[in-house]
Regions:
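Structured catalytic core of nucleotide-sugar glycosyltransferases
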Residues: 1-65
Length: 65
């Protein structure tokens, strides 16, 4: 998984009910690491965490209980 002799990078963000902050967190990681894949692991949130993360370009995985 090396491209241009650099390792691939993935950012993994576990979260629960983070709709207030998740958009900024995803944007900041995408700006700091433009080649990285940003994954948000939503741990059964009851708010709009997953929706907001996806809208900001994160790859969202939902973890049901």
């Amino acid at each position: 998984m090396f491209e241009n002799n650099l390792p691939s990078v993935a950012v993994l963000l576990p979260c629960f009910n983070e709709e207030v902050t998740i958009g900024k967190v995803v944007r900041d990681f995408k700006a700091a690491l433009p080649g990285a894949a940003v994954y948000v692991y939503d741990n059964n949130s009851t708010d709009r965490t997953a929706e907001i993360a996806a809208a900001e370009g994160a790859i969202v995985r939902k973890e049901p209980r």
